[in-house]
Amino acid sequence: MVEPLLSGIVLGMITVSAFGLFVAAFLQYRRGNQFEI
């Protein structure tokens, strides 16, 4: 009974953390480009 809930939480955490890393990298990349110009 608990395993589906646990796997769902783990998948959600992985998705959110991956999305957060992508957004942070994108913002840092844009900020670097603005500094260069």
From Swiss-Prot:
Source taxon at top rank = Eukaryota
Q: List cellular component terms (GO).
A: chloroplast thylakoid membrane; cytochrome b6f complex
Entry's localization field: Plastid, Chloroplast thylakoid membrane
Gene Ontology MF terms: electron transporter, transferring electrons within cytochrome b6/f complex of photosystem II activity
Task: Give the UniProt record's GO annotations in the biological process aspect.
Answer: cytochrome complex assembly; photosynthesis
SUPFAM superfamilies the record matches: PetG subunit of the cytochrome b6f complex
UniProtKB keywords:
Chloroplast, Electron transport, Membrane, Photosynthesis, Plastid, Thylakoid, Transmembrane, Transmembrane helix, Transport
What's the family?
Answer: Belongs to the PetG family.
HAMAP family (UniProt xref): Cytb6_f_PetG
Q: How does it assemble?
A: The 4 large subunits of the cytochrome b6-f complex are cytochrome b6, subunit IV (17 kDa polypeptide, PetD), cytochrome f and the Rieske protein, while the 4 small subunits are PetG, PetL, PetM and PetN. The complex functions as a dimer.
Q: What is this protein called?
A: Cytochrome b6-f complex subunit 5
Which organism was this protein described from? Thalassiosira pseudonana (Marine diatom)
* Primary gene name: petG
